[in-house]
Amino acid sequence: MFSKVNLNDIQLEGTLHNSGSRKMLVSKDQTTSKYFEAMTYGYIPAGVKYEMHDHTNIIEICIVTKGSGIIRDMEGKTEEYKVGDRFIFPSGIKHEIENNTDKESEFYFIRFQDQ
């Protein structure tokens, strides 16, 4: 049996460090996969930085759908992001996302367990 939900009906919730907001599109308990963790839609307001963080035993895929800015990792690697870019953050790699513009940025985040 399948399930349906309209994304407009999903409530916004805060993110780590209150540096943005997100919608939990699919959570682990809504699937039967032992590796799937979550799929969210994230929002980072203009001029805000999503602070350096990591995901223990979680691989995170980030797809930019709106806006531009900078992504950094703990080793100092810096990449600009723009609409259409895809990033993969391996488990345990600290990273931050900075919206250094005057417009909101939006992303899909997909997370899988590493093991």
Residue ranges and their predicted role:
Residues 32, 45-48, 68-70, 113-115:
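Short, charged/polar surface micro-motifs in flexible loops or helix N-caps
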Residues 44-46, 81-100:
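Conserved metal-binding segment of the jelly-roll/cupin
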Residues 91-115:
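Ligand-binding loop in jelly-roll beta-barrel domains
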Residues 39-43, 61, 78, 86-88, ...:
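Conserved hydrophobic/aromatic beta-strand scaffold that supports enzyme active sites
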Residues 1-37, 51:
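A short, N-terminal "cap"/entry segment at the start of jelly-roll beta-barrel domains
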Residues 21, 35-40, 60, 67, ...:
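A generic structural signal for short beta-strands and their flanking turns/coil linkers
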